[in-house]
Design a protein with these regions (language model features):
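Short amphipathic alpha-helix in the helical subdomain of ABC transporter nucleotide-binding domains
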Residues: 20, 168-175, 193-197
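N-terminal intrinsically disordered/low-complexity leader segments
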Residues: 1-22, 164-166
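Short, basic, alpha-helical segments at the C-terminal edge of helix-turn-helix-like DNA-binding modules
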Residues: 76-81
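Helix-turn-helix
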Residues: 23-26, 30, 34-68, 72
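Hydrophobic alpha-helical connector segments
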Residues: 72, 86-117, 170-175
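Amphipathic C-terminal alpha-helical segment
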Residues: 109, 156, 175-192, 204-209
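Amphipathic alpha-helical segments used for helix-helix packing
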Residues: 98, 113-134
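Amphipathic alpha-helical packing segments from all-alpha helical-bundle domains
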Residues: 82, 97-101, 133-159, 173
Length: 209
């Protein structure tokens, strides 16, 4: 019988780090799900520990404070949004096709929510728009990144001859407002919200674009 493999201290440390990173990602993802329904202010280390069947001290070791947990939830939700909305759109050509894909993906994300409370971005911004601090800063940075992406593709679309004469920021603002409103209306049971938003977006971008 061969001797058992002896792990070095460095290997043991690496495994612990990997296990810790996986645990942190799992908890952060659940925190984002909970926050999508109950808000980021409703998060607690104890609540998440109970939901996931782990010790509160273990969660505290990974995150330290409620604010760190909130920030991790924001980052996890951002990654989900990128995976479902932004990244697939990058398979489309730059400009109007990609802009269309970004908005279509977001509407699908709203129509068939990945998180139980619908679009985390919409809920989080509404909750923290008047609460200065690191969490608001993280949400604002995410929003700024999203607007920058929309404006970039709007600019490219204009180079292709679409939406001439429109201010890219103003158009991005309109598109964002439409889908955000559709998310809220859809959560309130308005079945016309998504098709209404799609029709208005077609009018803004040009039905044949």
């Amino acid at each position: 019988v061969s001797d058992p493999v002896q792990l070095s201290d460095e290997q043991i440390s690496d495994q612990r780090l990997l296990k810790g990173a996986r645990a942190r990602a799992t908890i952060a993802r659940h925190a984002a799900d909970v926050a999508s329904v109950e808000g980021l202010t409703g998060l607690s280390l104890g609540r998440l520990a109970g939901d996931l069947g782990v010790s509160k001290s273990g969660v505290a070791t990974l995150f330290g404070t409620k604010e760190n947990l909130q920030l991790a939830a924001v980052q996890s939700a951002r990654e989900v949004f990128i995976d479902y909305v932004a990244r697939p759109a990058f398979e489309s050509p730059k400009g109007m096709p990609r802009l269309r894909a970004l908005i279509a993906n977001w509407l699908s994300y709203v129509d068939e929510p990945v998180m139980p409370g619908g679009c985390f971005r919409v809920a989080g911004l509404a909750e923290f728009d008047s609460r200065p601090g690191p969490v608001r800063d993280a949400l604002a940075a995410d929003r700024a990144d999203w607007f920058a992406l929309l404006e970039k593709e709007i600019g490219r679309a204009q180079e292709q001859g679409f939406v001439p004469g429109r201010d890219p920021h103003a158009l991005a603002f309109q598109l964002d407002a439409l889908v955000s409103s559709a998310n809220t209306a859809s959560r309130m049971g308005d079945e016309s919200a998504i098709p209404t938003a799609r029709a208005i977006i077609d009018a803004l971008l040009g039905a044949d674009a």
